[in-house]
Protein backbone atom coordinates (compact mmCIF):
# COMPACT_ATOMS: atom_id res chain seq x y z
CA UNK A 1 0.00 0.00 0.00
CA UNK A 2 1.22 3.49 -0.85
CA UNK A 3 2.62 5.50 2.07
CA UNK A 4 0.81 8.82 2.46
CA UNK A 5 1.12 11.78 4.79
CA UNK A 6 -1.29 14.62 5.36
CA UNK A 7 0.28 17.85 6.63
CA UNK A 8 3.40 15.68 7.08
CA UNK A 9 1.68 13.26 9.49
CA UNK A 10 1.44 9.61 8.40
CA UNK A 11 -2.07 8.35 7.62
CA UNK A 12 -3.42 4.88 6.98
CA UNK A 13 -5.03 4.24 3.60
CA UNK A 14 -8.04 1.94 3.65
CA UNK A 15 -9.56 0.06 0.73
CA UNK A 16 -8.30 -1.85 -2.27
CA UNK A 17 -5.21 -0.35 -3.88
CA UNK A 18 -5.61 -0.06 -7.65
CA UNK A 19 -2.94 -0.53 -10.27
CA UNK A 20 -2.59 0.14 -14.00
CA UNK A 21 -4.25 -2.71 -15.88
CA UNK A 22 -6.96 -3.34 -13.27
CA UNK A 23 -10.57 -3.27 -14.38
CA UNK A 24 -11.96 -0.09 -12.85
CA UNK A 25 -14.42 -1.06 -10.12
CA UNK A 26 -17.81 0.58 -10.12
CA UNK A 27 -18.81 2.90 -7.28
CA UNK A 28 -21.80 4.98 -6.25
CA UNK A 29 -21.47 8.64 -5.29
CA UNK A 30 -23.83 11.62 -5.15
CA UNK A 31 -23.86 14.62 -7.50
CA UNK A 32 -24.65 18.24 -6.60
CA UNK A 33 -28.37 17.58 -7.11
CA UNK A 34 -28.28 14.68 -4.61
CA UNK A 35 -28.69 12.11 -7.40
CA UNK A 36 -26.75 8.86 -7.29
CA UNK A 37 -24.06 8.55 -9.94
CA UNK A 38 -21.91 5.54 -10.81
CA UNK A 39 -18.75 5.07 -12.83
CA UNK A 40 -20.83 3.09 -15.33
CA UNK A 41 -22.89 6.22 -16.06
CA UNK A 42 -19.85 7.36 -18.06
CA UNK A 43 -19.13 4.07 -19.87
CA UNK A 44 -17.66 4.53 -23.33
CA UNK A 45 -15.78 7.68 -22.30
CA UNK A 46 -12.29 8.24 -20.98
CA UNK A 47 -12.67 9.16 -17.30
CA UNK A 48 -10.11 11.28 -15.52
CA UNK A 49 -10.97 10.84 -11.84
CA UNK A 50 -9.51 13.68 -9.79
CA UNK A 51 -9.69 12.95 -6.07
CA UNK A 52 -9.33 15.74 -3.52
CA UNK A 53 -9.51 15.79 0.30
CA UNK A 54 -11.75 18.90 0.28
CA UNK A 55 -12.65 21.01 -2.72
CA UNK A 56 -12.55 24.30 -0.82
CA UNK A 57 -8.79 24.39 -0.17
CA UNK A 58 -6.14 26.01 -2.35
CA UNK A 59 -4.47 22.88 -3.77
CA UNK A 60 -7.79 21.08 -4.27
CA UNK A 61 -9.24 24.14 -5.96
CA UNK A 62 -6.25 24.41 -8.30
CA UNK A 63 -6.41 20.69 -9.06
CA UNK A 64 -10.10 20.85 -9.93
CA UNK A 65 -9.74 23.94 -12.10
CA UNK A 66 -6.61 22.73 -13.92
CA UNK A 67 -7.96 19.29 -14.82
CA UNK A 68 -11.27 20.75 -16.01
CA UNK A 69 -9.52 23.35 -18.17
CA UNK A 70 -6.99 20.90 -19.65
CA UNK A 71 -9.46 18.09 -20.33
CA UNK A 72 -11.95 20.38 -22.06
CA UNK A 73 -9.69 20.06 -25.13
CA UNK A 74 -9.77 16.25 -25.11
CA UNK A 75 -12.27 14.25 -27.16
CA UNK A 76 -14.56 11.77 -25.40
CA UNK A 77 -13.11 12.61 -21.97
CA UNK A 78 -14.90 13.52 -18.77
CA UNK A 79 -13.34 14.81 -15.54
CA UNK A 80 -14.94 13.53 -12.35
CA UNK A 81 -13.84 15.36 -9.21
CA UNK A 82 -14.55 13.32 -6.09
CA UNK A 83 -14.32 14.35 -2.43
CA UNK A 84 -16.24 13.73 0.77
CA UNK A 85 -17.51 17.31 0.81
CA UNK A 86 -21.27 17.59 1.00
CA UNK A 87 -22.94 18.15 -2.40
CA UNK A 88 -24.15 21.57 -1.22
CA UNK A 89 -20.57 22.70 -0.56
CA UNK A 90 -19.46 21.38 -3.95
CA UNK A 91 -22.29 23.24 -5.68
CA UNK A 92 -21.45 26.48 -3.86
CA UNK A 93 -17.74 26.11 -4.76
CA UNK A 94 -18.50 25.55 -8.46
CA UNK A 95 -20.71 28.66 -8.55
CA UNK A 96 -18.13 30.79 -6.73
CA UNK A 97 -15.30 29.59 -8.99
CA UNK A 98 -17.24 30.02 -12.23
CA UNK A 99 -17.13 26.32 -13.10
CA UNK A 100 -20.82 25.44 -13.50
CA UNK A 101 -20.06 22.51 -15.82
CA UNK A 102 -17.49 20.83 -13.58
CA UNK A 103 -18.67 17.41 -12.44
CA UNK A 104 -18.19 17.23 -8.68
CA UNK A 105 -19.23 14.08 -6.88
CA UNK A 106 -19.52 13.39 -3.17
CA UNK A 107 -18.42 10.14 -1.51
CA UNK A 108 -19.68 11.32 1.88
CA UNK A 109 -22.41 8.70 2.33
CA UNK A 110 -20.56 5.41 2.49
CA UNK A 111 -17.11 6.02 0.99
CA UNK A 112 -17.94 3.65 -1.88
CA UNK A 113 -15.35 5.21 -4.16
CA UNK A 114 -12.67 5.53 -1.49
CA UNK A 115 -13.02 1.88 -0.49
CA UNK A 116 -13.02 0.62 -4.10
CA UNK A 117 -9.89 2.62 -4.98
CA UNK A 118 -7.98 2.38 -1.68
CA UNK A 119 -7.78 6.09 -0.93
CA UNK A 120 -9.63 6.56 2.38
CA UNK A 121 -7.42 8.28 4.96
CA UNK A 122 -8.67 6.35 7.99
CA UNK A 123 -7.65 8.87 10.64
CA UNK A 124 -9.35 11.79 8.88
CA UNK A 125 -12.25 10.15 7.00
CA UNK A 126 -11.12 12.09 3.94
CA UNK A 127 -9.95 10.86 0.55
CA UNK A 128 -6.24 10.99 -0.27
CA UNK A 129 -5.26 13.27 -3.13
CA UNK A 130 -5.04 11.01 -6.15
CA UNK A 131 -5.74 10.69 -9.86
CA UNK A 132 -7.02 7.73 -11.87
CA UNK A 133 -7.51 7.57 -15.62
CA UNK A 134 -9.93 4.94 -16.89
CA UNK A 135 -10.09 4.26 -20.63
CA UNK A 136 -13.32 3.79 -22.60
CA UNK A 137 -13.04 0.00 -22.09
CA UNK A 138 -13.09 0.41 -18.31
CA UNK A 139 -9.41 -0.31 -17.66
CA UNK A 140 -7.26 1.77 -15.35
CA UNK A 141 -4.44 3.22 -17.46
CA UNK A 142 -2.98 5.68 -14.95
CA UNK A 143 -2.83 5.97 -11.17
CA UNK A 144 -1.22 8.44 -8.84
CA UNK A 145 -1.67 8.63 -5.10
CA UNK A 146 0.12 11.81 -4.06
CA UNK A 147 2.50 10.96 -1.18
CA UNK A 148 1.90 14.23 0.71
CA UNK A 149 -1.70 15.40 0.80
CA UNK A 150 -0.82 19.08 0.47
CA UNK A 151 1.24 18.54 -2.72
CA UNK A 152 -0.08 18.78 -6.28
CA UNK A 153 -0.52 15.73 -8.50
CA UNK A 154 1.45 15.35 -11.72
CA UNK A 155 -1.00 17.20 -13.98
CA UNK A 156 0.98 16.67 -17.17
CA UNK A 157 1.31 12.90 -16.72
CA UNK A 158 -2.41 12.48 -15.99
CA UNK A 159 -3.48 14.59 -18.99
CA UNK A 160 -1.04 12.71 -21.22
CA UNK A 161 -2.50 9.39 -20.02
CA UNK A 162 -6.01 10.65 -20.79
CA UNK A 163 -4.91 11.70 -24.29
CA UNK A 164 -3.50 8.22 -24.96
CA UNK A 165 -6.40 6.31 -23.39
From Swiss-Prot:
Q: What else is known?
A: The active site is a conserved redox-active cysteine residue, the peroxidatic cysteine (C(P)), which makes the nucleophilic attack on the peroxide substrate. The peroxide oxidizes the C(P)-SH to cysteine sulfenic acid (C(P)-SOH), which then reacts with another cysteine residue, the resolving cysteine (C(R)), to form a disulfide bridge. The disulfide is subsequently reduced by an appropriate electron donor to complete the catalytic cycle. In this atypical 2-Cys peroxiredoxin, C(R) is present in the same subunit to form an intramolecular disulfide.
Q: Which HAMAP family match?
A: Tpx
Q: Which UniProt keywords apply?
A: Antioxidant, Disulfide bond, Oxidoreductase, Peroxidase, Redox-active center
Q: Which gene encodes it?
A: tpx
Question: Its quaternary structure?
Answer: Homodimer.
This chain's source organism reads Listeria innocua serovar 6a (strain ATCC BAA-680 / CLIP 11262)
Recorded GO MF terms:
thioredoxin peroxidase activity
Q: Which reaction does it catalyse?
A: a hydroperoxide + [thioredoxin]-dithiol = an alcohol + [thioredoxin]-disulfide + H2O
* Tagged with keyword Disulfide bond: yes
Q: Which Pfam families match?
A: Redoxin
Name it. Thiol peroxidase
Amino acid sequence: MTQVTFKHNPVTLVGTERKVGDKAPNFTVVNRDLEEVTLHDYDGKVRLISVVPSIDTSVCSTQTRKFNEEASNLDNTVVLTISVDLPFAQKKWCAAEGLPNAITLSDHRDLSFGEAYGVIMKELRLLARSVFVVNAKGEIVYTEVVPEGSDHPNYEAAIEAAKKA
